[in-house]
Amino acid sequence: MTKSTDPRLADESKPEEIRRRARELAEDLPQLAKIALEAMIRDHNPDYKGTANKAGRAGMQSGNVSELTAIAKVKPGGADRLRRIFDLTNGNMDGAQRVSTLHDMRFVFFDDDTRILFATTYDGDWDTYINDFATKIPGLMDLLFANVEGWPGIDSPKVKDFIADHQIDASGWFVANPQVTVVDTRRYQRMEHALDDFLEKSRANA
C-alpha cells in the first residue's frame, strides 16, 4: 500500500488510513466493476482497444494517440500578445494543418497570466511529433512560444530538452477512438463527402 503524498493526509494514522481506503473502495466498487466489464467487452473489438504506454521520451500513448502537457512561465505581456494572435486566427491555425499527426492544441493562462499550460493530442511518438513542428511549422511555433520564458527557438538543438523539462505526464489518459489517426479521419471525411455527392447525383438523375 503506497503512502499518499497529499500533505492534507500527513497526520493520518495507519488505522485511519486503512479505514479511509476501505471506505473509498466500497464507494468506488460498483463503478469499478462496470469499468472492468466494459473493458472485457472492449477487448473483443480491437478498434476500441486503448493502452497506457509511454509516447517516447515523455507523455502517454493510447493506441495510436499520444498526449503532451507542458507548463511554463510567460514573459511579461506575453499572455496579451498570445490572446491577440488567438483572436486573429479565430480558432483556425491553418499552418498547423501541415502537421498531419496533430489532433488539437490548447493554451490556458493561469496565475494572473504569469504561466501557461500547453496541451496537445497527436499521433505517434514524441520525437517524431517535435520534429514535425520543427520542419513543417517552425515560424508558427516561434511566433507562439517566443512568449514563453527560456524558449530557445524551434530550430535550437536544446528545444527538445526544453519541452521535456516542462512537460508533465498524464496520470490517466483515455482516448475514445485510440486507433483512429488524423490521416484516418481525413480519409473517412473524403469518403463520406464522395458518398454524399454520389447519392445526391443519383437522386437528381432518378
Regions found by a protein language model. Name each.
Residues 2-115, 124, 128, 157-206:
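Short S/T/G/P-rich N-terminal loop/turn motif that feeds into the first structured element of a domain
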Residues 147-161:
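Short proline/glycine- and acidic-rich turn/helix-capping motifs at secondary-structure junctions
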